[in-house]
Amino acid sequence: MVIALSDSFIENPRSFLQRFQDALFAGSKPDLQGTLGIDEEVSNIFATEERIRKIPNYLDCKWSELKTGQLLRLQGMVQDTNFGHEFFAGAVEVNENIWRGCRYILDFSEDEMHLDESKIVLDERYSLFLTNVPGERTLPVIEALGNWGSESLKERSLKYSNRLQASNDTGVCVKCYGGMETKVQVCQAIDVIGIYEEPSEYSDGLPILHMLCFKDYTQSATQAPSPQQAEIIRPKILKYFEKVLGENIAAESLMLALLSNVVHKTTGLVIGGFTLNLTNCTSELVSQLVSVLRPLIKRMVIQKVNVAELNRKPLYPLSDGETLDTSHLQVAPGTLIVLDETELSSGTLNDVGCRNVQFLSSLISQQDLTFFYPFSSFTVHSNVRIIILSHGRSILPADVGCRCRGDSPDTIEFPTDSDELQEFCNFFHMWNMRANIPENMLDYIQSTYVSSRQYNKEINEKTLSLQINCSRLYAKSFGRQLVSRIDFEAARSLINHWTVN
């Protein structure tokens, strides 16, 4: 019986990696620059979703049963790309001109540990701190820590609680080889295949995953609907939104905001993003809306915006120069951020509160997520979706405002049929789809703009930009990748009901 290479690799990954390195170094002193082709080899072995699913998922395993050296898969967000750097023996000369590769090989014989320096080629690795994708999935970390059977490990893990957003979140140290750390960005959600190493005093109680390869983890794999399917699903979702918001225009506007996606960004200009401010909201309405959105949007965080909350602690990632504290809004691309202003009243902001407002304004208007250090700061691009729920006009710079009903709706009976619910989820997976404007539509849009300006001088380039952006979102809501006249005219009509900020 022939065993598939993927099955053989899962059963004994270190044996495969040892043979691969030994063959690569045969007859010559190793050059340890780059990944050695290991990442490509592993990616090819697990090139299909069927093969990848055979790899045990770290989030589904009982931690007490995990053993050093086994192959694991893990999805998470990169909280910090600068979590450590170390040198180690990347290869050793076991006989004259016969070299043994040591990358990913976590056990050494006594003889190999006491070799002369001339018989060792040094390698280096960089560490990332990976945690749960905010708003997506959590683990009962206390129970898991108990599985390790050591109170001292449990205590040491608390050292990194400042990097975790919730008490039941977990952190993993991911070690990168051959420059792979340069391909990863902070806040990026990644899907990693690697070699597991059990927590120890050496790792300060953190589990370790030695990265073999990774890919971007946008969201759980789903099948976006076809245009025919989207046309059927769309009105069903709008029906639920309208029940909560009480207005068809507000429901349509919310749908477009949930499908927004930054497609291009230059200094001072963000294309594709769409921040909606729903006004006339109550706390009860917010609660109902969140309960409707939560099963549909796989990454969603709720942030109250009031004086007490703004003054309480930073909403931005903050470093003291030694360690990086996470924040509630250090989130991965594609996350929906719901800003709840319904409890906002007059008051005085302290220094933290002022910085939080500045941070939120930059996040909304520029899609910049700012990290603050003692004497500097830096920003990373953040492709997030944002809706603001408030009584009156928001204190934050939303693109448009739209009034909803305001009174508390009756209990919403959301679909319990799993297939229909999955269809709804798949619909909003279209947020990262791109709808383009064909050449013939560009001429139509330009002529329409010129004609509109003759009758209404208040229509300007900002209005035109909003019309174009919303026509793209409208096309996406029907599963179409090309904008039509119908989409553009529908967007123009919708904008007439908005307050453009």
UniProtKB/Swiss-Prot annotation:
Localisation per UniProt entry: Cytoplasm; Nucleus
Family membership noted in the UniProt record: Belongs to the UPF0616 family.
Record lineage: Eukaryota, Fungi, Dikarya, Ascomycota, Taphrinomycotina
Name of this chain's protein: UPF0616 protein C1687.04
Domain of life according to the entry: Eukaryota
PANTHER family: MINI-CHROMOSOME MAINTENANCE COMPLEX-BINDING PROTEIN
Main location: cytoplasm
GO cellular component: chromatin; cytoplasm; cytosol; nucleoplasm; nucleus
Pfam families given in the database record: MCM_bind (PF09739)
Gene Ontology terms, MF aspect: chromatin binding
Keyword annotations from UniProtKB, A to Z: Cytoplasm, Nucleus
GO biological process, one term: DNA-templated DNA replication
